Amino acid sequence: MPHHEFECSKVIPERKKHAVIKGKGETLADALPQGYLNTIPGSISERGCAYCVAKHVIGTPMKDVIHISHGPVGCTYDTWQTKRYISDNDNFQLKYTYATDVKEKHIVFGAEKLLKQNIIEAFKRFPQIKRMTIYQTPCTALIGDDINAIAEEVMEEMPEVDIFVCNSPGFAGPSQSGGHHKINIAWINQKVGTVEPEITGDHVINYVGEYNIQGDQEVMVDYFKRMGIQVLSTFTGNLSYDGLRAMHRAHLNVLECARSAEYICNELRVRYGIPRLDIDGFGFKPLADSLRKYGMFFGIEDRRKAIIDEEVARWKPELDWYKERLMGKKVSVWPGGSKLWHWAHVIEEEMGLKVVSVYTKFGHQGDMEKGMPRCGEGTLAIDDPNELEGLEALEMLKPDIILTGKRPGEVAKKVRVPYLNAHAYHNGPYKGFEGWVRFARDIYNAIYSPIHQLSGIDITKDNAPEWGNGFRTRQMLSDGNLSDAVRNSETLAQYTGGYDSVSNVREREYPAFERKVG
């Protein structure tokens, strides 16, 4: 296993074991960087904190909730409106967020009275909202504010409201992934089993680890409904607070993002006997395999086959149009956690791209254990990289595009490497058959953007650029080396879907399947 030592990190020798280049024929154990350890002092990590992920990733997608952070306003601002967790209630949870705005005097004298005042004010400001989540931050955790007691006090005085308390201060784990565990366990301990749902079908699931980034959840739920499956709750995208309290009545937990939500799945299995089925909504083959899994589980294979046949016939020619033009282009897959193993292999197989690097900021060893076997020889894998290591990797690998978040992505743009936002998306949804074509389209648009012809011009020089055959369009750039048969194909086509695919899903009417059980 050739560990890779970055030049910029030679002064921090411990960093060497956090990056590896996968060699030929290496076993799984040989090709894993160390992961999910405390950040090494001096490495200037880009990780977030446990508070951030509890509120920002898992809590915020709940659509009918007032989200209030007990701490300084900076904590709240950093977790507000940075991901597109849309909902079908006019995106209430994205428009508003609350902070108790703790100051120095509250650190000295305590901030429990301030918290209670803010809770009551928030409910009065939005009388139609009766549910709230309170998030603990480091400073109020360190001074010992009892937010559980305050929540109980308010619920006694206002019996029509319900409050969930998330004790996940920023220091509650080596990275933001500590917050995944904290909020998972807190929710099942405090709220699951406190509401009894209406069961309307024979096949009932919880869709776990899906947060409806630009409509991903709604696309997947559409497939479930077309198969006659009742989605009791989604943890936590585009779902109501009370819906999540009824998770204990599902027949199956369908798990998407294992990194953020496997903990509640495991607890639901232990406490309520609900089995877990891991699925993947990214890519034609992984999605088709996932549909087969729960089709077989519920004995409704005929329904899933009809959906797969219809969707593949509709969208496969468009995916292949992009595959022909992306073939051999190099990509660095630099998301946060589980997307590195959701995407690495299927991007190569279905889009023709070559994955040259994967990294994770907060992933565990399990993420690398799943991801590295899906990568080819020579792939650079990095755990918890900093900005300088990222720039050095770009210089060494020279990818045509990176799939990452906004912070490393904007840095990459400065060195003329395009990126797609792997966290909040550019033009999602990216799940589903159509979504995967949208993803390929966005990758294509980024790589072949005509702007790159201008970005390389040195504007300090007086000489006009030599355009040769003139300014080239995106398709002129992508089609130059294609055969005439591919270029003029009558079966392949660019993406023909609309700008807003989610509205169509929301308007769909679903078949009524006869129930076998009363």
Swiss-Prot record:
It catalyses: N2 + 8 reduced [2Fe-2S]-[ferredoxin] + 16 ATP + 16 H2O = H2 + 8 oxidized [2Fe-2S]-[ferredoxin] + 2 NH4(+) + 16 ADP + 16 phosphate + 6 H(+). The gene is anfD. This iron-iron protein is part of the nitrogenase complex that catalyzes the key enzymatic reactions in nitrogen fixation. Other nitrogenase complexes utilize a molybdenum-iron protein or a vanadium-iron protein. Keywords: ATP-binding, Iron, Iron-sulfur, Metal-binding, Nitrogen fixation, Nucleotide-binding, Oxidoreductase. [8Fe-7S] cluster binds at C49, C75. Hexamer of two alpha, two beta, and two delta chains. Transmembrane segments: none annotated. The structure of the 8Fe-9S-C-homocitryl cluster is assumed to be analogous to the 7Fe-Mo-9S-C-homocitryl cluster. This is Nitrogenase iron-iron protein alpha chain. GO terms for biological process: nitrogen fixation. One of its GO terms (molecular function) is metal ion binding. Binds 1 [8Fe-7S] cluster per heterodimer.
